From Swiss-Prot:
UniProt function note: Probable substrate-specific adapter of CUL3-containing E3 ubiquitin-protein ligases which mediate the ubiquitination and subsequent proteasomal degradation of host target proteins.
Residues in Kelch repeats: 252-297, 298-346, 347-395, 397-441, 442-492, 494-539
Name this polypeptide is given: Kelch repeat and BTB domain-containing protein 1
GO BP: any one term: symbiont-mediated perturbation of host ubiquitin-like protein modification
Stretches assigned to the BTB domain: 21-88
């Protein structure tokens, strides 16, 4: 006798011939003979049953008629060394039986089989099963598979068997794999139609209402399973009072723009969620000290230096939808560098900077509307400056800090509207070269230079400005002081990355924890190179449907974009 497998084979031979068998498992009219000792060694259920007062020690049979005979028989064979023969059709029955009999190794083997074979064709079936039998491992895996394949599953025959509670979980999840929020109501409507169940307010609350197009909102109003429910109509009538929603994880692409070594190319990088790395998707010959603005998913780069010693008036752009460069854009009114860039729904703005002729500071704000042949002067800053923070919030252009005459930083904060300039609460410290972002109705700035006289102190400060109360709040400082970093917001979280620290460009990133008010180094968003950063922008996926007129079959039209 060399090993345990040979021993179990001999014992199985005894079972087949009836030798030493001391128990019969009875299931309806079927009997399975076995040995108490062997069953007790493999099954916690049998171990407790045979070593307690559950049955008379002299009794030679156990009735398990509430279980599936074939599954019990397969598991008894498994205990006696015969491998399980698993398929998608039978694995659920064997797993639930193994779970009842508490045969740990069989449970693990069945779970591993399901996890290995889990796909869009069976994930709903396994999710319903796991939910019923409280198997968290399979439930989590199948839940994530449904999230990933949700648009493929809305026409699956099992889609209608998902419960309202399950649909609330799916529709609420940030990881729901849709590239545009308009697809979430489509998922909801397809489920309502398959179940013929009227909509509820709880289901509508799962949608990111503020991100929906007017056409889809109209589709919700007009659908019989939504529009006929008074509570649902009341909810939709009050959507203007709902808080702003954050896009789902898959509905945006995170794009960064930067340069690494001197005279290196401009790099356009896209964040790869699966690998937690940045992929360089395009590059273009060297340019530095330019302004960046994003409009309609096109990244515009204005002015700066190229490989010549002179400032440039050229404007180039990168289309994130077509992954192509655009060069036929009207030039700025004159060459400039170290300027600021923002955009509203119509215009791109180039603000301040340094002029090429005599390196004088610029006060003009020029703007350009795509399709127009030239740039126009829109306004002038009160004090000429460069390297300031700029932001567009609530239709106002904010200009923050910057470098003014005498190479000193300033602490001014002013906003421009159609009525002119307005001064606001000054910065707590004079700053320039910081990164700026609008997040959750506030302006955030981080890093840069700070000094009351000569520009020379690298900052790790992070500040937020509340326009309602006209006040600045100091947040926890960055771990690494840096100038010209990128500050960005994704899924209600703040990140900062790149820039220059101690005269060396860095590729490190940090994440802000709002509850703990602290920044932590974030290896997941570490940049591919040491970058001076010009922008890190979440790009929302757009579809042609956004400019389509509403029709009664708009949701069917929307469905035609699945897979595109």
């Amino acid at each position: 006798m060399n090993n345990s497998s040979e021993l179990i084979a001999v014992i199985n031979g005894f079972r087949n011939s009836g030798r030493f068998c001391d128990i019969d498992i009875v299931i309806n009219d079927e009997r399975i003979n076995a040995h108490r000792l062997i069953l007790s060694g493999a099954s916690e259920y049998f171990s407790i049953l045979f070593s307690s007062d559950f049955i008379d020690s002299n009794k030679y049979e156990v009735n398990l008629s509430h279980l599936d005979y074939q599954s019990v028989n397969d598991l008894i064979d498994y205990i006696y060394g015969i491998p399980l023969s698993l398929t998608n059709d039978i694995v659920k029955y064997i797993l639930s039986t193994a779970d009842f009999l508490q045969i740990g190794s069989a449970i693990t083997e069945c779970e591993n089989y399901i996890l290995k074979n889990l796909c869009s064709r069976n994930c709903i079936d396994f999710y319903i099963y796991a939910d019923k039998y409280n198997n968290k491992k399979i439930e989590t895996a199948s839940f994530n598979t449904i999230l990933l394949n949700i648009l493929r599953l809305i026409n699956d025959e099992n889609f209608k068997y998902l419960t309202e509670e399950s649909m609330i979980k799916f529709l609420s999840d940030d990881m729901l794999n849709i590239k545009n929020e308009d697809f979430a109501p489509l998922i909801l409507i397809k489920w309502l139609e398959s179940t013929q169940q009227p909509c509820t307010v709880e289901l509508l609350r799962c949608l990111r209402i503020s991100l929906l197009s007017p056409q889809v909102i109209k589709s919700l109003y007009s659908h019989r399973l939504v529009g006929s429910i008074y509570e649902c109509i009341t909810f939709l009538n009050n959507i203007s009072f709902l808080d702003e929603s954050f896009p789902r994880y898959h509905s945006i692409e995170l794009i960064s723009i930067g340069i690494s070594n001197s005279h290196d190319k401009i790099s356009i990088n896209c964040y790869n969620r699966k690998k937690n790395t940045w992929d360089i998707i395009s590059s273009r010959r060297y340019r530095c000290s330019f302004a960046v603005a994003v409009l309609d998913n096109i990244i515009y780069m204005m002015g700066g230096y190229d490989q010549s010693p002179y400032r440039s008036s050229k404007v180039i752009a990168y289309n994130t939808c077509t992954n192509s460069w655009i060069y036929d854009i009207p030039e700025l009114k004159y060459p400039r560098s170290n300027c600021g860039g923002v955009a509203d729904d119509e215009y791109i703005y180039c603000i301040g900077g340094i002029r090429d002729q005599d390196s004088s500071l610029i006060s003009s704000i020029d703007r350009w509307k795509p399709s127009k042949p030239y740039w126009q002067t829109y306004a002038k800053i009160r004090e000429p400056k460069c390297d300031m923070g700029v932001a567009m919030l609530n239709g106002l252009i904010y200009v923050i800090g910057g470098v003014v005459k005498g190479d000193t930083c300033t602490d001014t904060l002013e906003s421009l509207s159609q009525d002119g300039w307005m001064m606001h609460q000054r910065l707590p410290i004079k700053m320039s070269n910081m990164s700026t972002i609008v997040h959750a109705g506030k302006i955030y700035i981080s890093g840069g230079y700070n000094n009351s006289s000569v520009v020379n102190g690298i900052s790790n400060l992070v500040l937020s400005y509340n326009p309602i109360y006209d006040e600045w709040t100091k947040l926890s400082s960055l771990n690494i002081p840096r100038i010209n970093p990128a500050l960005w917001s994704v899924h209600n979280k703040l990140y900062v990355g790149g820039g220059i620290s101690d005269d060396i460009q860095t590729n490190t990133s940090e994440t802000y924890d709002k509850e703990k008010d602290c920044w932590t180094l974030d290896n997941g968003h570490m940049l591919p190179r040491n970058y001076i950063m010009y922008k890190c922008e979440p790009i929302k996926h757009k579809y042609p449907l956004e400019k389509t007129q509403y029709t009664n079959d708009f949701l069917k039209y929307l469905e035609s974009f699945i897979g595109s």
